[in-house]
Amino acid sequence: MKRYSILLAVSMVFISALAADINIVFTGDILLDRGVRRAINRHGVDHLFSGGIDSIFRSAQVVVGNLECPATKIVSPVQKLFIFRAEPEWLGALKAHGITHLNLANNHSIDQGREGLMDTRRNIIAAGITPIGAGQNMDEASEPVLLASEPRNVWLVPSLRLALENYSYLTDKPCVSQEPMDSLLNRVHRLRKADSTAVIIVSLHWGGEHTLRPISRQRWDAHQLIRAGADALICHHTHTLQTIEDFHGKKIYYSIGNFIFDPTRPLNSQTCMVRLKVSETGLETETIPVEIRNCVPTIVDHF
């Protein structure tokens, strides 16, 4: 009996060690307006989540999406070409399907002005989701977000790398994270020095829309961020699946494309999710191919 008790104890320790690993999933752009709004009006928000997506989300402790529109009742559009707005009550369905964090460091979060941005942030919190990359000022907006603390800290550092249309860059007003690159590099470097065993993920909203490859300056900046201490870059904005690079053993996803979206071309329908498995000593990265069909992201076997 004593021998069996010892074996059971050893087995439980082994199971606990396995359970200590954490899965974190990243998705591309989530648009809840335009064609997606029409789909929601016809079928409801739940229709946007296929069984395969739900299964992936259920396997994760953290799911991070890029919300490509303000979710607010405030209608105060800025003067720009594409202006979006989602209904805040739709955020509850995102939470119900497993999304835990929403990135706002993009070029559409400000579509309904500063008040719309901060109202979106409040609405995300009210839905039980953590907002990323927006705040009362640039310092707050640029703060790294702790995604997980077990089995070790996992930090996400967000940043918009694009100029905003007809929107003043004011660091002391409500805004999205948009600090200069040298400041971003210093932030990652300081975080690495302060938390040497952490996993640091950088999420950039950048690149040329509808292109398949990053430009040389993007590659340079991405490499500098890895050298500064980032463990991976998982980026978006181009509405396409771009180059996936391995640099010094670290993954760089220059753009993972759309997620919940209304693409009109096959180029914009091919996308991916990224799943990170974090253990006490390792980081595994998995690319999950996705195809968008009638606004609904669907798991596929290959690109």
Region spans (language model):
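Acidic, metal/ion-coordinating pockets
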Residues: 19-303
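Sec-dependent N-terminal signal peptides
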Residues: 4-15
